[in-house]
């Protein structure tokens, strides 16, 4: 074989080898694109929360080209179990304290991706219009169940009515109060009774469910209301092993919109606060 033929064979071989390498190099990218075309599965609680999240689903599709499939649940233990078992990519239903307890009790490896909304606890009154009007020695009613007791104390602390030993303790009790500048008298009662106590106390801290049943809205009637910085903000949560999936941040962006917030205000009679 002469030199020209040898050179030709070598060039053909080199080109063939390069083409093979290029095909191999491109294969993972093609696979990745195919995987990202799958709908993002997000778990939510059935009812108004699901209706509200449908607005985010629509925005994700129309603005970002992301398909989101909502999976609805009726029990609070289900969305984290489904996420843990990889039946979901994310869920949007729980607060920080609930998530921390689930991780502690069940060993789930979960990650916070972003905030959604706060269904705020608030303090209501028939005797004052502004918290500055609260007199020394006033009686303040709060829920008597552990999680809402702590939540009420944190709300009172946020507005300068008391100080807790650990200012971020979501399991705080009255025993954790170290300062009470207005000498308020705290009375604990069953959550369902608090709205009926408004005639007898200066202030009552009532959660959203029972306030709503009594026609009270934190937005319109609350004297003091939880803010977006509350540890009780609801979250978008994924697993640790998929927290870097870019589709998750796209879903969060789709949720954190005025359209979703306005739908939530309508569905929950003004009883929500933006968590972002």
Swiss-Prot record:
Residue positions of covalent lipid attachment, annotated as N-palmitoyl cysteine: 20
Gene3D superfamilies tied to this protein: Periplasmic binding protein-like II
A Pfam family matched in the record: Lipoprotein_9
Localization: Cell outer membrane
Keyword hit for GTP-binding: no
Lipid tethering residues (S-diacylglycerol cysteine): 20
Highest rank taxon of the organism: Bacteria
Main localization, broad class: membrane
Record's keyword terms, sorted: Cell outer membrane, Lipoprotein, Membrane, Palmitate, Signal
CDD domains per the UniProt record, alphabetical: PBP2_lipoprotein_IlpA_like
SUPFAM superfamilies, per the entry: Periplasmic binding protein-like II (SSF53850)
PANTHER family, sorted: D-METHIONINE-BINDING LIPOPROTEIN METQ (PTHR30429), D-METHIONINE-BINDING LIPOPROTEIN METQ-RELATED (PTHR30429:SF1)
Name by which UniProt lists this protein: Outer membrane lipoprotein 2
Species: Mannheimia haemolytica (Pasteurella haemolytica)
Organism placement in taxonomy: Bacteria, Pseudomonadati, Pseudomonadota, Gammaproteobacteria, Pasteurellales
